Every structure is written in C-alpha cells, then in structure tokens.
UniProtKB/Swiss-Prot annotation:
Domain of life: Archaea
One annotated GO molecular function: ribosome binding
Keywords: Initiation factor, Protein biosynthesis, RNA-binding
The gene coding this protein: eif2a
A Pfam family the protein falls into: S1
Name this protein carries in UniProt: Translation initiation factor 2 subunit alpha
Organism expressing this protein natively: Aeropyrum pernix (strain ATCC 700893 / DSM 11879 / JCM 9820 / NBRC 100138 / K1)
SMART domains xrefs: S1
Subunit structure: Heterotrimer composed of an alpha, a beta and a gamma chain.
Length: 277
C-alpha cells in the first residue's frame, strides 16, 4: 500500500520498471489540472504518468474536473515513455470500451490474487518479493492470470500448483486459502431427450437408456462435471450439465447423447434429442 499525493493506492509489483508504448494500463488519478492530470500506475509500483488534456476524450472537454477526479481509477494507453525520467504519457481517449472492461477485470482479479498470496507470505515469514517471484509470477506464466491458477487449484488440487512450479512450502497454504476465498464460476448446458418404447418392459428400457447417458459423466469426474436428469413428463426428459467451462460441457453432452442414441437403438427405443436455446 502506498500513499502518493494524498491518494492511497494498493500497488502491484512490476516485472519490468516501465510499461511499453501501446500497453494498456490501470492508473489512479492523483492530481487534476486545467492542462491535464497526473496518475499513479497501479501495476508499476507507483510510476507517475501524465495524461494531457488533449488525450482525455475524442470530443472537446470544457471542464476537465467534470471528467476526472482524484482517486478515480482509469484505464489508459501508454503513448510515450521517458526511460531516463522514469515517467510516461498516457491517453484515455485511445482506449476502446471493450479494452477498458477487459483490462479492469484482469486488474481486479490480479489484485485479489496478490492480496491473498501476500497474506500467506506473511504467515510463512516470506517477503512480498518472494510472494511474487515464487507464486504470483509463476501462476501468471502458467495460466496467463494468477487468479486462474488459484481457480485451477480449487478444481485440480496441488497438481495445478506443482505444474506451475510453485515451491512445496506454499502449496498447502495456497490450497487452503483458495478453497476458502476463491469462487469458481459455474456454467450450465440444458438439453432434452425424448424416449418412447411400446414394449412390455418399455419403462425398464428407457431407464437403461438414461443410465447409459449418465454413465458417461464418470470420465469427466476430474473436471467436476455434474449431470442431473429430470422427468418433464413422459416421454420427455430434461438433462442439466453443470461444470466450470463450456468446452468440457460440450464434450460431455456429445458423449451422453451418443451413448443414449446407441443404447436406444439397441433396445428398440424411439430416440430424439433437442438442445435448449
């Protein structure tokens, strides 16, 4: 945590001293003047950046104070880098809305991961530098985002951390913290099976078709895929697949439908499949 010009900011530790030209970064407004504003770059240890008045918006801004205020978080693009002075110039107007949204989401997730790992470091008697070097940067390299690494730890256990090269002494504390403080968003796919049999043991045949479909989920056990089957009203059955990514659910759906189709054909059960929009 740092306090610059009265603006308290939680600073992330940078892997390089200055950002590159064209890089999208997060900054905290420090001072606002008629000619522009000064920011602190949160991801670069408090590097100072200047946002010229002409780079605030595409249309003319009459009152800069109505657009920018001290302590405000902004997403900006680096347009000039002064290596000798350790400063940069940035632009607000050159960042698209989609870039702002994506960058702010990444930053917030990184900030949460850093906060959790730094708390663990304190308990282990480790420094902040060690927290970044031994955990955060390793998870970022392996998963593109340290929070994704912690989410993987929730789903896969210690293997996800070992894969990233995290030292053994960190693994159990990280697993414990991740399971308590990291929530992995679930996704769902719904589809319907229509199964008809006019045979005397038709109910039993339909049950076997449904069992054949559900048995396919066993191969997705490590991915934490859950399947639930509900009777909408014979002969229609609603199947809900829940997991942590759509790609895995799509594979599970394909296997379930194929198993149901083959079993239905073998048992003489009329079969049809329909996805929910």
């Amino acid at each position: 945590m740092s306090e610059e010009g009265g603006v308290e900011v939680k600073l992330l530790k940078p892997r390089k001293p200055l950002p590159d030209v064209g890089e999208i970064v997060v900054g905290t407004v420090q001072e606002v003047h008629d000619y522009g504003a000064y920011l602190i770059l949160d991801e670069y240890g408090g590097v100072r950046a200047f946002l010229p008045w002409s780079e605030i918006a595409s249309r003319a801004v009459r009152n800069i104070h109505a657009v920018l205020k001290p302590r405000q978080k902004v997403v900006v693009k680096v347009i000039r880098v002064y290596k000798k002075r350790g400063q940069v110039d940035v632009s607000l107007k050159r960042v698209m809305d989609s870039e702002k949204k994506r960058k702010m989401m990444f930053y917030k997730r990184y900030l949460k991961a850093a906060t959790l790992v730094e708390l663990i470091a304190e308990k282990l008697g480790k420094s902040v530098d060690e927290a970044y070097r031994e955990v955060l940067w390793k998870l970022e390299d392996a998963y593109g985002d340290p929070m994704k690494g912690l989410e993987a730890a929730v789903l896969q256990g210690r293997e996800a951390l070992e894969k990233a090269g995290v030292p053994e002494e960190w693994i159990e504390p990280l697993l414990e913290t991740a399971k308590t403080h990291v929530r992995v968003k679930t996704v769902k796919i719904t589809f319907y099976l229509t199964l008809r049999s006019m045979a005397g043991d038709g109910v039993e045949r339909v049950r076997k078709v449904l069992e054949a479909a559900k048995s396919q989920i066993e191969s997705f056990k490590d991915s934490k895929v859950v399947a639930r089957i509900y009777t909408v009203g014979a002969p229609k059955y609603r199947v809900e697949l829940q997991g942590y990514n759509y790609k895995t659910l799509e594979k599970a759906l394909e296997k379930m439908v194929e198993a149901a189709r083959k079993t239905a054909s073998k048992l003489g059960v009329e079969f049809s499949f329909e996805r929910e929009d």
